[in-house]
């Protein structure tokens, strides 16, 4: 059999874990001065990037807005991971939007059936 002390210790650990999981505690990783330094670095990076973009735009000159550049014209986006497109609803939302969803599904499915 398991001793009462072991059960008591396990119960206390379980309660402590449950309380810790429910509380939202803030534990500072950085000091205030470190955070200020990090923000300053980020600000400097942003200024550098905007300066570089401005210099490049001055070098290239104005583009014809009607004609897209060749690079953008031939650009193809390839997905590296499968993408799930969809919406999740709970039962209350499903009841609320049932008529609209049925209408949308019938619009999509009827042309598919007519093509066959």
Curated annotation (Swiss-Prot):
Q: What is its main location?
A: secreted
Cite the GO molecular-function annotations of the record: hormone activity; motilin receptor binding
Give the highest taxon in the source lineage: Eukaryota
What are the entry keywords? Answer: Cleavage on pair of basic residues, Hormone, Secreted, Signal
Q: Give the signal peptide as a residue range, or say none if absent.
A: 1-25
The subcellular localization recorded is: Secreted
Q: What are the start and end residues of every segment in region (Disordered)?
A: 39-74
Q: Name one GO cellular component term.
A: extracellular region
One Pfam family per UniProt: Motilin_assoc
Q: What is this protein for, i.e. what is its function?
A: Plays an important role in the regulation of interdigestive gastrointestinal motility and indirectly causes rhythmic contraction of duodenal and colonic smooth muscle.
Family indicated by similarity: Belongs to the motilin family.
This protein is called what? Promotilin
